[in-house]
Amino acid sequence: MIIYATAVQTINSFVKLESLKEVYGLIWIFVPIFFLVLGIITGVLVIVWLEREISAGIQQRIGPEYAGPLGILQALADGIKLLFKENLRPSRGNTPLFSIGPSIAVISILLSYSVIPFSNHLILADLNIGIFLWIAISSIAPIGLLMSGYGSNNKYSFLGGLRAAAQSISYEIPLTLCVLSISLLSNSLSTVDIVEAQSKYGFWGWNLWRQPIGFIIFLISSLAECERLPFDLPEAEEELIAGYQTEYSGIKFGLFYVASYLNLLISSLFVTVLYLGGWNFSIPYISILELFQRDQIFGTTIGIFITLAKTYLFLFISIATRWTLPRLRMDQLLNLGWKFLLPISLGNLLLTTSFQLFSL
């Protein structure tokens, strides 16, 4: 009996150990996701505050200053206000499409953050097809906008949804061709491999110098994908009131508001990863890997700081562009995408392919 009881206790202890391992495994799955979401939310709040301050400076007026020190909590105050507003629905609209549209737009953008390397070995999902996954997922967002426009049963919303779909298709193709050129240079579709391929010569090893034409096209296409001025045709206030957002209020309108800044942040991060060397130093022959080998925490922190510094540099350019340039007409926007950017990006891809073949 004593041997039997001992065996039972041993088996129970092993069962408890296995269950604890499963619990710890689940915890370690959700902890990185939690910190990533927390960082994304913080980044969006900072972007909103920066845009308000930069726009105030360009327009020579006083920006937000009452909600927290220097108005840094203004975005949080706006979010709380939208959270408590009534969530109205159009009486003759398509309720399922109207409700699902904002969620599709936000979720498709959030999933793209999983393949962003913020520092060395600091990435949620290091996939061999990371760039391809981002392009595939980002193509889903316009479907949510089109569903929102159609489900609102409003002519302005529907026109805004159609414009969003047309604009996304027009600029997704040149953007994809630029990304393929970078993949050819790096011989990989992994975001980590692309960053490491730029780490040899510091500032001079960036893809910005090897792909200057692709960088400019990617920059323009990214602004168009984010629907920022001068490419904000889907929600042009003078023409469509608020475009596909016209019938939305409360938290659903807030989701669209957050989605626009999430898209701007992810585009800036991909500019950093693809063209500006990611987490690598700008100084030649000084690698972040050396710091990482000496002290992992310090090296990772420096890598995050470098990545965010480059990202917010592009964000500043995007915000300044919004408050500087006038809006294009719809025909000008489509002509720019199909007749100008697409042929140049295709020629850039063919030229890159030729150089890679001759260098073998």
From Swiss-Prot:
Catalytic activity: a plastoquinone + NADH + (n+1) H(+)(in) = a plastoquinol + NAD(+) + n H(+)(out); a plastoquinone + NADPH + (n+1) H(+)(in) = a plastoquinol + NADP(+) + n H(+)(out)
Membrane topology: Multi-pass membrane protein
One GO CC term, this protein: chloroplast thylakoid membrane
Superkingdom of the organism of origin: Eukaryota
Cellular localization per UniProt: Plastid, Chloroplast thylakoid membrane
Secretion signal span: none
Biological processes, Gene Ontology terms: aerobic respiration; photosynthesis, light reaction
EC number: 7.1.1.-
Regions crossing the membrane: 27-47, 98-118, 129-149, 248-268, 269-289, 297-317, 340-360
Keyword Cell inner membrane: no
GO molecular function, one term: oxidoreductase activity, acting on NAD(P)H, quinone or similar compound as acceptor
Principal location listed in the UniProt entry: plastid
PANTHER family the record matches: NADH DEHYDROGENASE SUBUNIT 1, NADH-UBIQUINONE OXIDOREDUCTASE CHAIN 1
Subunit structure as annotated in this protein's UniProt entry: NDH is composed of at least 16 different subunits, 5 of which are encoded in the nucleus.
Functional note: NDH shuttles electrons from NAD(P)H:plastoquinone, via FMN and iron-sulfur (Fe-S) centers, to quinones in the photosynthetic chain and possibly in a chloroplast respiratory chain. The immediate electron acceptor for the enzyme in this species is believed to be plastoquinone. Couples the redox reaction to proton translocation, and thus conserves the redox energy in a proton gradient.
Entries under NCBIfam families matching the protein: PRK06076.1-2
Protein name per Swiss-Prot or TrEMBL: NAD(P)H-quinone oxidoreductase subunit 1, chloroplastic
Species in which this protein is naturally found: Capsella bursa-pastoris
